[in-house]
Amino acid sequence: GKGVFVIMLDICLLGTGGMMPLPYRWLTSMMARYNGQSILIDCGEGTQIAMKEKGWSPKPIDVICFTHFHADHISGLPGMLLTMGNAERTQPLLLVGPKGLSRVVSALRVIAPELPFEINCMELTESEQTISMNGFRIEAFKVNHNVPCYGYCIVVDRIGKFQVDRALELAIDKRYWSILQRGESVSTEKGNFTPEMVLGEPRKGLRVVYCTDTRPTESIVQHAGNADLFICEGMYGEPEKQAKARENKH
């Protein structure tokens, strides 16, 4: 029968609490794993403990994205950086967040001044920005909180189906088929071949949207409307708390 194509994207909600931790709920943090890489979105107090409880590791984290700079979303960062350093991490770490990220990180690093790896800060200045990773991308989009705040969308694209008849017509040696199928070009004695020559139309991939601390916005509708998984806050879920939600921009 036909093979089934599966995109393995693991999502773990490490913390879902707001303002203060509870015995059963740490402060805000979400981790995603794909293709040997990990993304952390927010790093509230208790993130490391939750990671240990779930059996996840901070070692493969390539990027940490911050929605905004309230303490319950970022106060776990210094300890996380120190743990990475103690684990002898040497590869650079990318931090992504609203304007002012470098200043906030510098202040938090007063208690984590010496690290064996480089930290690169990417400050978001547009209403929408894309960060390209290895095999997937992160889309940041502005939302509406009482400080600059962004939602994030993790997108795993799926390339088109390999067209055997096209490959045969072009007389491409079969040993190169798997390379082209991965989306990589090849240079052979018969010439150069690109994936576009042998792949069909792109197929539906996977889209995960994470959004917290915001009023309802059109940007959320645009990015989450066709999401496979939409993770959203519910800080003031009860009807009697609607006025409080509007006041605090939740």
Residue ranges with predicted function:
Residues R103-V110, C121-E126:
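A gly/proline- and charged-residue-enriched helix-loop-helix capping module
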Residues G1-I7:
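Short, Lys/Arg-enriched N-terminal segments with co-localized hydrophobic residues
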Residues S127-E128, P216-H250:
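Binuclear metal-ion centers of metallo-dependent hydrolases, dominated by the metallo-beta-lactamase
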Residues M80-L94, M197, P202, Q242-H250:
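P-loop/Walker A phosphate-binding loop and immediately adjacent motor/lid segment at beta-alpha junctions
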Residues I41-G44, I61-F69, G97-P98, V208-T214, ...:
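Active-site neighborhood of phospho(di)ester-bond hydrolases with catalytic His/Asp-centered motifs
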Residues L22, F136-Y210, T214-H223, L229-I231:
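Active-site-proximal loop/helix segment associated with metal-binding centers of metalloenzymes
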Residues E45-V96, E118-T125:
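Active-site metal-binding motif and surrounding structural segment of the metallo-beta-lactamase
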